[in-house]
Amino acid sequence: MKKTILLLVSVAAMALAADVMAETRDEIAKIGQNVGAEGKFSYWTEGSVPLAKLKNFVERVTNPQSDGFVPQSDRVAVFDLDGTLVCETAPSYFEWMMYLHRVYDDPTFHATKEQIATADTIKKAVYARSVPGDMMWTEAIAQNEVFAGMTDEQYREYAIEFMETPVEGMTNLQWGEAIYLPMAEVVGYLAANGFTTY
């Protein structure tokens, strides 16, 4: 009897999960904006220690009467992308997958044989889930080569366009939707409190 109930619960959970969609980029942006300067967090446990520490920090640096006050022009928050804001294992780092997209799938880019060989090596390591230590350096140099000549704005536009491509191996998920929603709230909260975020 217990096995039957467990099986039914499992099947019901899978049926419900099959219909779940990721938030769109517009919805994610609204999640960040909805927090506001006062910190109305929906994806954090109210009263949790990390949330309390974050709110206390922001109160301290934004209150002109506080010893810890930081002028708005000096408020900066820098985030690591992979593993902090987006999933880093779908199947690998965002920028690595964008690099592979550029080499293999971008009709406006004509990769050299050497660039394709490097991409093949990186792709093999990514899908084997065995990235050697020196691969980070190899990939960084390769990134620089395939995006050389782009202005900052062109690179930004390219990344935004890449965000609209599906995540390989996932259903109904684009790269720009693979955002941790609690972190979207943190970014929005800091921005609403005068932080420049990177």
Features from the language model and the residues they span:
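Gram-negative bacterial Sec-dependent N-terminal signal peptides
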Residues: 2-21
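Alpha-helical substrate-recognition element adjacent to the catalytic core
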Residues: 23-77, 81-198
